[in-house]
Amino acid sequence: MVRVRFAPSPTGPLHIGGARSALFNYLFARKNNGVFIVRIEDTDLERSSRESEKNILESLKWLGITWDEGIEVGGENGPYRQTERLDLYQKYAQKLIEEGFAYYCFCTEEELEEERKNLLAKGEMPRYLGKCRNLTPEQKEKYLAEGRKPTVRFKVPAGRTIVINDLVRGVVSFETDGIGDFIIVKSDGIPTYNFAVVIDDVTMGITHVLRGEEHLSNTPRQILIYEALGFKIPEFAHISLILGKDRTKMSKRHGATSVENYREKGYLPEALVNFLALLGWSPGTEEEIFTMEQLIERFSLDRVAKNPAIFDLDKLNWINGYYIRNSELSRIVELSLPFFQSCGYVSQNPTEEEMRKLTKVVEATREYVVTLSELPEHAAIFYQKELAFEEEAKTLLADEEARNILRKVADKLREIPGSEEEEIKGFLKKLPKELGVGGKKVYMPLRAALTGKTHGPELYQVIAILGPAEAERRIMNLFN
């Protein structure tokens, strides 16, 4: 059975790259009727926090990425936080030492820095040269007496080529001579990433490791640990980096970098999932809109690209706009409510009347926005008593003929029997004939008078939302 995992470090919010890794693992597990595990790699004690952990888990849930085993949901392979598994790492580190695959290293940071500088001066790759590999018991005692706290290093075999058959990148090989003996347990007893990740993956039965390309260089070290402990090596798939449009590493200047930022800006979870799936994966067709169910059905690693994925904010905006326009109206109203509340257009405990109006407002304006946060700006014409007039609208309303027509329209507005859209549509349709002028001469100044703009929602929607009385008031304001 396929078993995959997402293992974030809780040192900050869930970033776009992490969200994509989680999504690809989730899709792969669901496609193959497998198990998706979420565990927390919190061995960076200084930077890890429960607050960040909470943010990451909430962001995953918001995206609709659920897990079968792991943090919060439990399972038979727990605990699922690395800081709660230290005894396990210690046990396997001791096994490696006893079997001659690892050793205690007493080198100080100063000594290691000196060694690094010397290698660089010779034009060689910095690596540990094995000074403590073959210490005598007396030398170890001497270092301990000096108060030195040892690390544990893995003994890297010389002259080997490690070959990885990566499911995305194909055959990749590494020479062990360029690696050097690496630390697996720090002097404070905390395991390093490369060691802990192997122990976790093995004890949790992980069959496939899908992760970012930046982890590729760690893979030979991890394979050496698998081999030394006699563990089965999982399949690896390293997903390409996400770059900005300028082909540099994704950063804040390319747009928001965390899932939380996009949520706050009014992006829909299904739009972000759709967009993230297309960052490095291709369906093999021209289609661009996919539900989670469709992604699960279509996803495969052989359609994941080796080349870097380009983060195109315009494309995300297009996808998000599509979902805003085409999702159930009631859902968009519910999701947009906080944005209307934060600017004071809707109260914190909305009345039925407020919600009825909001529903009409969202229906009238949603086709003009790409994020929910833009809705209040487009809806301001329905909530603000004083309109801000665009220059084009001012010019239109300065025309004497237009002003005369508007006076007549104001009188006619009193004749509308109610404020239902169909009634208003009928009223608007017969208005030009009743006034004896072309439709354009009625509708353009009327729109300008009611909204301060020359473009926007359908006129019948504008009057239905404002109500005939408010529409009349706005027209008469022009003459006061």
Curated annotation (Swiss-Prot):
It comes from the Bacteria. GO terms for cellular component: cytosol. A motif ('HIGH' region) lies at residues 8-18. PROSITE patterns: AA_TRNA_LIGASE_I. Keywords: Aminoacyl-tRNA synthetase, ATP-binding, Cytoplasm, Ligase, Nucleotide-binding, Protein biosynthesis. It is found in: Cytoplasm. It catalyses: tRNA(Glu) + L-glutamate + ATP = L-glutamyl-tRNA(Glu) + AMP + diphosphate. A motif ('KMSKS' region) lies at residues 249-253. It holds the Pfam family tRNA-synt_1c. GO terms for biological process: glutamyl-tRNA aminoacylation. The keyword Electron transport does not apply. InterPro entries: aa-tRNA-synth_I_cd-bd, aa-tRNA-synth_I_codon-bd_sub2, aa-tRNA-synth_I_CS, aa_tRNA-synth_I_cd-bd_sf, Glu-tRNA-ligase_bac/mito, Glu-tRNA-synth_I_codon-bd_sub1, Glu/Gln-tRNA-synth, Glu/Gln-tRNA-synth_Ib_cat-dom. One of its GO terms (molecular function) is tRNA binding. ATP binds at residue 252. Its main location: cytoplasm. Its EC number is 6.1.1.17. The keyword Ligase applies. Belongs to the class-I aminoacyl-tRNA synthetase family. Glutamate--tRNA ligase type 1 subfamily. Monomer. Catalyzes the attachment of glutamate to tRNA(Glu) in a two-step reaction: glutamate is first activated by ATP to form Glu-AMP and then transferred to the acceptor end of tRNA(Glu). This is Glutamate--tRNA ligase. It comes from Carboxydothermus hydrogenoformans (strain ATCC BAA-161 / DSM 6008 / Z-2901).
